[in-house]
Amino acid sequence: MNYRKDFASQFGEDGIIEKIFDLLPAGDHWCVEFGAWDGKFCSNTNHLLSEKNWSGVLIEGNPKRINDLKNTYKNNPKVYPINKYVNFEGHDILDNILSPFPIPMDFDFLSIDIDGNDYHIWKSLAKYQPKLVLIEFNASIPGDIEFVQPADLSLQQGSSILSFVNLAKEKGYELICINQVNGFFVHQKYFELFGIKDNSIKALKHFKEPLQVFQLYDGTMVFHGTQSLYFYNTPVDLNKKLQVLPRFLRHSNFVWSNNQFYRFIFRIYKLFFLKKSKSSMNGDTEQNTWSWIREYKSFLNNKTAE
């Protein structure tokens, strides 16, 4: 992480990539990036293409941005701008998009950043084995959780770094670096060149503390760690916004007391405001709730009679 440097990249990727290729054996200097935007904004390949004389295939699905991308490299015949949305199945998989170009099967660098189906697109790549793969993960998901967003082009959720590590191992890659939002993976035959003794997520982690959740005996939910809407840069007080029980029910009287009044109030709230389930830890059901209502009516009648 000491090699972070930005020429066009967002979080020091340019410097990290430069150092990685200082250690990797010399290749054919080919790179692939999607979504490429205009070829400059937050680009992980612009420095290689503009300053290092690399060749590249840049893929951008947005029809408005593709003109800017073509304009950026209009005087560079070694860059091939493509207007396509990369898919994980069907005709527009990455293997098919790359096949018309003179790009080696083991080209040097693949950058994947589409804010969603990154996992499924890398998984679908079969013919090509780039030396280095940079891929965006959802940094709000803790490093010990495996989460893969559904394979759906209409969704933009992202997947966890652990999911990418597991996928990488299946495909013959090893993690060598993590920055704020990207994982860097090299083909396993080059891993020893980096002298990394421990490439676990915990050892390489350099991103903000992810959100953790736990609950207290009275039903209070506690949220610890980064509390903001990820892409909206909006702070959120989750300890106030995401409580299952209202404050008046988070009281020892409702937890421990055998008082019928307190238990009646809780069951009424549970019946009308909490999601119904077939059973709960104490065996309460909707039928039991109505049974408590009848019992409480009887209790009130007896009090009145007294």
Describe the function of each predicted region:
Residues N2, L23, L229-F231, F254, ...:
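Hydrophobic transmembrane signal anchors and adjacent membrane-proximal interface regions, especially
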Residues N2-K5, D28-C31, M105-D108, L155-S159:
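N-terminal start-of-chain detector that recognizes signal peptides
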Residues Y3-P100, I112, A139-P142, Y217-G219, ...:
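SAM cofactor-binding core of SAM-dependent methyltransferases
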Residues F21, P25, Y73, P77, ...:
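Generic secondary-structure transition motif, activating predominantly at the C-termini of alpha-helices
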Residues D28-F34, K169-E174, K276:
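Short, charged low-complexity linear motifs
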Residues N46-H47, W54-S55, D106-I112, G116-W256, ...:
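Conserved acidic-Pro-Pro-aromatic motif
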Residues I268-E306:
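C-terminal non-catalytic accessory extensions
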